Amino acid sequence: MKAADVRALSADQLKEELAKLKKEQFNLRFQKATGQLEKSSRIDEVRKDIARIKTIARQKAAEAKA
């Protein structure tokens, strides 16, 4: 997910997307532990998407306060 796409989302949409990604991250970790994971690079992609969403959500919150 690109940063521009994330910036276009509302606060509620950001929370929903974050919850979805965290669930996916959990499932990927579980698949890795059981040896069923096919694309190990997806773990890094999801981790970076989560960080991107958290960063932009924090920036939006700071802008709203200022």
Swiss-Prot record:
A molecular function GO annotation: structural constituent of ribosome
InterPro entries: Ribosomal_protein_uL29, Ribosomal_uL29, Ribosomal_uL29_CS, Ribosomal_uL29_sf
Signal peptide as annotated in the record: none
Keywords: Ribonucleoprotein, Ribosomal protein
One GO BP annotation of this record: translation
CC terms in the record's Gene Ontology section: cytosolic large ribosomal subunit
NCBIfam families in the cross-refs: L29 (TIGR00012)
Family: Belongs to the universal ribosomal protein uL29 family.
Protein name (Swiss-Prot/TrEMBL): Large ribosomal subunit protein uL29
Protein's gene: rpmC
